């Protein structure tokens, strides 16, 4: 074989290798930049901020931090004697005005029976007015009693749902104010994923699509379903000045950063058992209308998926 032919073969092989490398790099780049996936995803759950509706000293805190509690279980109790005394006083007022109202009712009925032959119209009207006033006082006393009873009931704070008590920062003997958050309750079976996907990848994301979730530092793959895509995010490039005019940031036209949009993903019921704390990180891959079949994926694609999902 001549020297010229060898050169042609070498050049051809080199060109072929370069073309294959360019194609491979392009495919990898498209795989990483266009496919709907993100490492910026967070485990999230419904969290209830527990705060008392009355103020007072804490007498009991029978739960521990991070304890699983049932719906209706006592979380803490506020000192009750003051509220018991207020209820007793309100009940006494109700009893007094009930007796007084009955007495004024009899008096008014008696005067109406006697009529203007024995009494003046003014005396009859006066009895009716007194009865009406006492009835209003009775209604007010009943309202005060009901409020005192409600306050007494609210001294015992119970779990509104089944879940985990977390960030418990109160103890027996402390004074707690009405409305001050004492503990957070992470509701059980409410965990979901908020995946922050770039806007360039939203074309491949639709409600009902399946998703794979890989928690950071874990080999376990969880599954879920896309619930919804956020309807809007903050426009950081525009704001209003003191006169209400629009203020637009100066951006370079050739540098455009893709905005991230929250996508809510519901975990499958069988994956709710795996407890990953709310706020922890995960990698999310949107697989389309159906779950990804691991037997139909090439080894190279599996490797690329794993490198992408590795946290």
Curated annotation (Swiss-Prot):
Q: Name one GO cellular component term.
A: plasma membrane
Asked if the Swiss-Prot or TrEMBL record annotates the protein with the keyword Hydrolase, the reply is no
Please name the source species. Answer: Yersinia pseudotuberculosis serotype O:3 (strain YPIII)
Compartment(s): Cell inner membrane
Q: What is the lineage of its organism?
A: Bacteria, Pseudomonadati, Pseudomonadota, Gammaproteobacteria, Enterobacterales
Pfam families given for it?
A: CusB_dom_1, HlyD_D23
UniProt-listed InterPro entries: CusB-like_dom_1, CusB_D23, MFP_Efflux_Pump, PHBA_efflux_pump_AaeA, RND_pump_MFP
Task: Enumerate the GO terms in the molecular function aspect.
Answer: transmembrane transporter activity
Q: How does it sit in the membrane?
A: Single-pass membrane protein
> What is the role of this chain?
Forms an efflux pump with AaeB.
Name which cysteines form disulfide bonds: none
Family as reported in the entry's similarity comment? Belongs to the membrane fusion protein (MFP) (TC 8.A.1) family.
| Translocase among keywords | no
Name of the protein:
p-hydroxybenzoic acid efflux pump subunit AaeA
The protein's UniProt keywords, in alphabetical order, are: Cell inner membrane, Cell membrane, Membrane, Transmembrane, Transmembrane helix, Transport
């Amino acid at each position: 074989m001549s020297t010229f032919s060898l050169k042609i073969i070498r050049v051809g092989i080199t060109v072929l290798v370069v073309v294959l490398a360019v194609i491979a790099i392009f495919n990898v780049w498209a795989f990483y930049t266009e496919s709907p996936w993100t490492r910026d995803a967070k485990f999230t759950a419904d969290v209830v901020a527990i705060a008392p509706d009355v103020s007072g000293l804490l007498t009991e805190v029978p739960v521990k931090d991070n304890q699983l509690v049932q719906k209706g279980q006592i979380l803490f109790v506020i000192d009750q004697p003051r509220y018991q005394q207020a209820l007793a006083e309100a009940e006494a007022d109700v009893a007094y005005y009930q007796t007084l109202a009955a007495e004024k009712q009899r008096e008014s009925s008696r005067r109406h029976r006697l009529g203007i032959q024995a009494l003046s119209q003014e005396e009859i009207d006066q009895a009716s007015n007194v009865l009406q006033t006492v009835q209003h006082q009775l209604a007010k006393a009943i309202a005060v009693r009901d409020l005192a009873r409600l306050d007494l009931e609210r001294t015992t704070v119970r779990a509104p749902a089944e879940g985990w008590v977390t960030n418990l920062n109160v103890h027996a003997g402390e004074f707690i104010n009405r409305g001050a958050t004492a503990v957070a309750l992470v509701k059980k079976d409410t965990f979901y994923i908020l995946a922050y996907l770039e806007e360039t990848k939203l074309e491949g994301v639709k409600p009902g699509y399946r998703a794979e979730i890989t928690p950071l530092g874990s080999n376990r793959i969880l599954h879920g379903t896309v619930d919804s895509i956020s309807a809007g995010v903050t426009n950081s490039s525009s704001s209003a000045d003191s006169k209400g005019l629009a203020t637009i940031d100066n951006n370079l036209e050739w540098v455009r950063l893709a905005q991230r949009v929250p996508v809510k993903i519901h975990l499958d019921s069988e994956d709710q058992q795996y407890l990953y704390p709310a706020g922890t990180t995960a990698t999310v891959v949107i697989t389309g209308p159906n779950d990804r079949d691991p037997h139909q994926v090439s080894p190279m694609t599996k490797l690329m998926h794993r490198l992408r999902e590795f946290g």
